[in-house]
Structures are given as structure tokens and as C-alpha cells.
């Protein structure tokens, strides 16, 4: 199965658990590039004896499934009275299939496109033309080309929805209605709400919860990930604490104690996919232990994993008060070190080069 690399790890792990071989391709290239997921999949099928390329973007069975099942189900459940249907477009099968059926059975029904900001499809609906493709984090909808199955000419109105609006709407859907849905659902619901608010009389409007939010727990429903993407933010403090990605007072920093064993520290490193931990005693940082410290002290002797962290940690810790100038932080990072940020002696968190770059990027995005 060929999958763009921006897809959530839950989707990828799920597919592998089912026995699929998952091949990741670049999501930063457009159609026609050899690393684009559709071009890669077609080439792989051509080169593999006995392979079958399903190609949902050009397979007539795709819209047919929606014309024969989704459309009549919606029509029956709403007793034949649907004013508008809000859809997203990935392969185009949902929109194309629904339009084909409703054109015959309910021609009054309008089709509304919910499109991620950065996709070209809303431009095509509005003007019949499109320019450069942008980028977006929402998964499963939005395109950098016009899917032939989509029948965009039948779309009444298109709404562009930013990642920020989509993710916040999906999170609100969970908080208010108890529905745990995926990222594209946030895009569709945002567009549906905008459409409804623009009407002058009540209408019966349909949209979809396209996927379970279980596939997005590491991304859209993870506050740390949302902050790293600049989609939610803490109040600015105007000091070095603004650069901390994982704050200790929020329980986000993984730490060690001086009397922890090296085995326990190594287990934490693997569990949280990190390479270094601050060592705390009475709320103060007394050292840092990283993978190289473990290598130097274990030296292939598994019995040495029982050594305490205090024997392996580096005691040379670069600590900055949160009120220090940014130039002092940069000087520490220039030496390839990680900076410990404190409020007087109280540990707040670590700052790495990546944390600084993320903070700077998010400032520009705002």
C-alpha cells in the first residue's frame, strides 16, 4: 500500500498490523513527480508481476459505490428532503457518485465543497482556474490536481478551511457532542456551519464524519503536536520559557532521579522516543543523561545497567534563568548543547535547537 508520509502513524500502524506492506512516499511533491504517491503506485504496479493497480482516482467503481449506497441511504433517512450536502474531495468518488444520483432523484439538492486551504479545488469551483498548490495538514481531502471523478462543475459553493479552523472544529465536536472524528471531518463541519449561517431560512444540510478520531490521537488531539504546528499556543510570557516545547509544570517533560538505574532510564528513552533526560533532585536539575552516557558506562556489560544515574550523568548543565536574553540561549545552542530553563532554581523545561526553530516559525505564521 502506497501512502503519503504526512498520514498519521496510527493509520500506518493499523495497516501494518493487518498485514499490509506500507511504502511511504513524499507529500511535498506534486502529481507528475516520480515520488508522488499515485505515480509511485502506478510504476510499482507496472514493475510487479501479477499486480493490480486499484487507482481509486480513475476507477468507476468508486463513485458507483456512493451512487448505489450512500446517496439512497441519505435520501431515505431524511425522507427525501435534503437542501444541501457538504462534501470534501480526495479521489472525487463521494462527490461524483452523490451528484449522479441526486441529479435524477433530487435535483434541488445543492452540493457544497469543503476544501483545505492550500488545495486547488475551491479555486477551480470559484473561477474555473487554479494556481500554485499550497500545503495543508488535514488528511484525506484536498488535491493538487482536478480528480476526474469529482464533477466539480456541479458544485454550488466552495469554502476554504484552514488547518487551524478544521482541527479546532473537530476538537470542539468531541467536547460538545462527544463525537471523536477525524481531521477531514473538522473541515467538512466548518464548511457546513459557514453555509448554514449564511442562509436566510432553515435548511436540511448533510455532511459526514469521515473517519474515527482514533487515527489522530498523536496529532490533532495531541496538544504538544498542535503547539509544535502553531495551531494552539500558550500565552506569550516574553521570556525564554516561550521556547520550551514540553513544559515540566504541565507534566510533559520526561525526567530521571539520581538514584534511578540506567536500565530504567533506557526504558524511558525507548518508551518516549527520546535520547536525553534531565536529572532532577528536589525540583532542581542536577545533571543530564543521554544515550552516549549510557554507552560509555554500560560498555556491553548488561550488569552495568543496574548502575545509578548519578554515576553516568553529565553534571555540566547549562542553566539559564527564563529572564536571560535570547543571545545567551543561542550561545549555548551554538555549542551543540541543550539549554535548561529555570525560574530562579525551579526547573521549567529544556530548549533544543528544534524548539527554537519551531517557536520562530510559529511567530512568523501568526
Model-derived features with residue positions:
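Active-site-proximal loop->helix
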Residues: 1-44, 117, 121-129, 146-148, ...
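Short glycine/serine/threonine-rich phosphate/pyrophosphate-binding segments
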Residues: 7-12, 88-99, 121-122, 184-192
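Active-site/ligand-binding-proximal alpha/beta "capping" segment
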Residues: 48-92, 97-101, 149-152, 156, ...
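Glycine-rich beta-alpha junction loops
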Residues: 58-61, 90-93, 115-120, 129, ...
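Bateman (tandem CBS) regulatory domains
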Residues: 154, 238-253, 260, 305-317
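Glycine-rich acetyl-CoA-binding "A-motif" of GNAT/NAT acetyltransferases
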Residues: 285-288, 326, 347-350
Amino acid at each position: 500500500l502506497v501512502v503519503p508520509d504526512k498520514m498519521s502513524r496510527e493509520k500506518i500502524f493499523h495497516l501494518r498490523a493487518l498485514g499490509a506492506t506500507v511504502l511511504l512516499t513524499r507529500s511535498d511533491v506534486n502529481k507528475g513527480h516520480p515520488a508522488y504517491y499515485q505515480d509511485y503506485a502506478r510504476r510499482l504496479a507496472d514493475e510487479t508481476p501479477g499486480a493490480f493497480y486499484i487507482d481509486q482516482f480513475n476507477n468507476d467503481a468508486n463513485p458507483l459505490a456512493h451512487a448505489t449506497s450512500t446517496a439512497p441511504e441519505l435520501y431515505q433517512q431524511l425522507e427525501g428532503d435534503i437542501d444541501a450536502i457538504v462534501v470534501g474531495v480526495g479521489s472525487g468518488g463521494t462527490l461524483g457518485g452523490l451528484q449522479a444520483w441526486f441529479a435524477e432523484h433530487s435535483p434541488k439538492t445543492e452540493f457544497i465543497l469543503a476544501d483545505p486551504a492550500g488545495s486547488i479545488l475551491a479555486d477551480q469551483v470559484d473561477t474555473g482556474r487554479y494556481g500554485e498548490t499550497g500545503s495543508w495538514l488535514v488528511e484525506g481531502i484536498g488535491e493538487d490536481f482536478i480528480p476526474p471523478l469529482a464533477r466539480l462543475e456541479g458544485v454550488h459553493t466552495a469554502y476554504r478551511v484552514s488547518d487551524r479552523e478544521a482541527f479546532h472544529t473537530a476538537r470542539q465536536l468531541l467536547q460538545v457532542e462527544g463525537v471523536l472524528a477525524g481531521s477531514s471531518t473538522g473541515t467538512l463541519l466548518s464548511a457546513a456551519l459557514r453555509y448554514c449561517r449564511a442562509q436566510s431560512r432553515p435548511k436540511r444540510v448533510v455532511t459526514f464524519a469521515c473517519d474515527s478520531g482514533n487515527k489522530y490521537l498523536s496529532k490533532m488531539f495531541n496538544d504538544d503536536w498542535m503547539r509544535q504546528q502553531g495551531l494552539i499556543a500558550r500565552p506569550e510570557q516574553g521570556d525564554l520559557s516561550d521556547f520550551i516545547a514540553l513544559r515540566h509544570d504541565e507534566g510533559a517533560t520526561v525526567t530521571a532521579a539520581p538514584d534511578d538505574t540506567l536500565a530504567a532510564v533506557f526504558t524511558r528513552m525507548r518508551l518516549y522516543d527520546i535520547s536525553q533526560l534531565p536529572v532532577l533532585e528536589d525540583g532542581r536539575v542536577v545533571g543530564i543523561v543521554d544515550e552516549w552516557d549510557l554507552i560509555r558506562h554500560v560498555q556491553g556489560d548488561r550488569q552495568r545497567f543496574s548502575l545509578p544515574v548519578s554515576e553516568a550523568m553529565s553534571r555540566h548543565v547549562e542553566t539559564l534563568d527564563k529572564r536571560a536574553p535570547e543571545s545567551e540561549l543561542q550561545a549555548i545552542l551554538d555549542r551543540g548543547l541543550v539549554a535548561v530553563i529555570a525560574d530562579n532554581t525551579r526547573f521549567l523545561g529544556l530548549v533544543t535547537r528544534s524548539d527554537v526553530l519551531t517557536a520562530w516559525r510559529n511567530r512568523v505564521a501568526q
